[in-house]
């Protein structure tokens, strides 16, 4: 039997030297574009189902909206392809799908509000969907702007103290303003100007995450210093508790002066998780949990709004027509949805107050059922896991803590929201990331996404190859005549 013929040189060209060149690293940008197209398809079909159920007529305008949505995120995709080519290909499509589903649900609730107004001969309210679309466009501008301007995320560490100060000021401003310029539904969390309302706490949490990531890296020895051992765990020394006490006092101040339980809980929990990641000490978690319990007990004893929320959580049907109406309607809506849901546009989610903001999870559970709600939660889970995977893969400590802090912010916020609407924990007023109606939350989430993508790009990029010093050919090497040393005469 004859030996097999060697492969032709045309099929496998060999460069000089006989070694094949290394293939270029994969950026997965084409996969990202395909996933964006799939997300657009899901959003368009969802819009079709809502229109068919509510309006009983479907026009080609739905396809135009779908194409416009795809074009908007295609621009974001091009920015990622140009300025973060090695970033995780799942982060942007997941955010696009969540944002799109949120727009569909807000539009569905707008139609319900219009029907209710027409039935009662009230003025038709202006739709909130148009405003949310505008904020989505502004979010894309912020997202692309961060990708373009921030060439290296490690630059943020140089300005960490400035960013931390700005974050603290942003948290404090609503408490200092008169109620007419800052208060809504009892919470002073807004800055209201003519034609503009901003919730600075949404942006402050990102600035504070950057600050704490830098401090935990620079002062790591302070947080990991040898302390006391108890029950097999190492606890920090009393004099090293200053930083976490400062964070605790700031969060208590937010709770006291702004009546914002959600933001104070979110910031303290995120800092506590980052502290544990930086030190790997369970003692910090125990101390943080104790401080959290002390703060809640103090707030319950001192402030009526905390007592009301706690009593509503424990006994939602005791005052059904007043304080318990929100959570009761939320539970009824989730029960109505069952496993498969009533179908998009076929439920009655507008019965729940603040269905577009605090209770949009209830809308999902009612119309898409437990299966649909689980699918949405799975999207968030994948987003958080990919963010934590970025934290593990990135090479520098600041990037690790930054990515972990941003990822856990989304995870903790989602847990607090879902726990509130399902009566697992008291209601806090936080909104669902990327989905709930609101400009400040959406813009801040796209800024968070841009930072996470920049860290992911650095984590997945191939390590730079160090150039070797050129070696002169042997023919061009200089020749030196060495003379054998003469033997020294013995004395």
Name each region found by the language model.
Residues 1-27:
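Short, Lys/Arg-rich, polar N-terminal cytosolic tail immediately upstream
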Residues 17-69, 74-258, 418-432, 437, ...:
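Membrane-helix boundary/helix-loop-helix interface segments in multi-pass membrane proteins
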Residues 67-72, 134-142, 366-385:
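Hydrophobic alpha-helical transmembrane segments
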Residues 74-78, 211, 297, 301-305, ...:
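Transmembrane alpha-helix boundary/anchor motif
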Residues 171, 181-197, 276, 284-376, ...:
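Hydrophobic, glycine- and aromatic-enriched re-entrant/interface helices and adjoining loop segments
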Residues 226-240, 387-408:
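Membrane-interface helix-loop-helix junctions at transmembrane boundaries of multi-pass membrane enzymes
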Residues 238-301, 313-315:
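Hydrophobic alpha-helical segments of polytopic membrane proteins
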Residues 391-429, 435:
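Loop-to-helix entry and N-terminal half of a specific, functionally important transmembrane alpha helix
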């Amino acid at each position: 039997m004859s030996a097999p013929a060697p492969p032709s040189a045309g099929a496998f060209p060999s460069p000089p030297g006989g070694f094949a060149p290394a293939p270029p690293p994969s950026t997965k940008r084409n996969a990202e574009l395909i996933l964006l197209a799939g997300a657009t398809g899901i959003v368009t079909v969802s819009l079709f189902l809502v229109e068919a159920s509510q309006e009983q007529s479907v026009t080609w305008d739905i396809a135009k909206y779908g194409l416009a949505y795809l074009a908007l995120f295609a621009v974001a995709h091009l920015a990622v392809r140009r300025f973060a080519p090695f970033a995780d290909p799942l982060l942007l499509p997941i955010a696009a799908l969540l944002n799109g589903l949120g727009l569909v649900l807000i539009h569905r609730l707008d139609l319900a509000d219009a029907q209710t107004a027409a039935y009662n001969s009230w003025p038709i309210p202006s739709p909130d969907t148009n405003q949310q679309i505008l904020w989505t466009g502004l979010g894309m501008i912020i997202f692309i702007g961060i990708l373009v301007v921030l060439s290296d995320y490690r630059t943020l560490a140089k300005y960490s103290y400035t960013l931390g100060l700005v974050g603290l000021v942003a948290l404090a401003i609503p408490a200092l303003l008169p109620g007419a310029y800052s208060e809504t539904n009892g919470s002073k969390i807004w800055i209201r100007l003519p034609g503009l309302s901003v919730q600075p706490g949404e942006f402050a949490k990102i600035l504070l995450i950057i600050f704490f990531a830098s401090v935990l890296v620079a002062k790591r020895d302070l947080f990991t210093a040898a302390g006391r051992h108890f029950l097999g765990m190492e606890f920090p020394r009393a004099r090293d508790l200053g930083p976490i006490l400062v964070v605790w006092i700031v969060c208590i101040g937010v709770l006291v002066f702004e009546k914002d339980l959600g933001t104070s809980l979110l910031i303290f929990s995120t800092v506590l998780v980052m502290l544990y990641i930086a030190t790997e000490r369970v003692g910090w978690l125990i101390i943080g949990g104790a401080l959290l319990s002390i703060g809640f007990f103090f707030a319950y004893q001192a402030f009526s709004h905390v007592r009301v929320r706690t009593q509503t959580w424990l006994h939602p049907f005791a005052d059904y027509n007043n304080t318990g109406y929100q959570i009761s309607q939320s539970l009824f809506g989730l029960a109505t949805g069952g496993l498969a849901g009533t179908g998009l546009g076929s439920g009655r989610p507008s019965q729940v107050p603040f269905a577009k903001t605090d209770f949009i999870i209830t809308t999902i559970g009612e119309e898409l059922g437990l299966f649909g709600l689980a699918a949405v939660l799975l999207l968030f889970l994948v987003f958080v896991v990919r963010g934590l995977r970025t934290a593990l893969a990135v090479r520098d400590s600041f990037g690790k803590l930054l990515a972990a802090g941003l990822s856990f912010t989304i995870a903790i916020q989602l847990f607090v929201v879902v726990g509130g609407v399902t009566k697992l924990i008291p209601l806090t007023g936080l909104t669902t990331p990327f989905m709930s109606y609101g400009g400040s939350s959406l813009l801040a989430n796209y800024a968070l996404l841009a930072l996470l993508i920049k860290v992911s790009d650095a984590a997945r990029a191939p390590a730079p190859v160090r150039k070797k010093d050129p070696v002169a050919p042997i023919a061009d090497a200089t020749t030196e005549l060495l003379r054998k040393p003469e033997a020294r005469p013995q004395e």
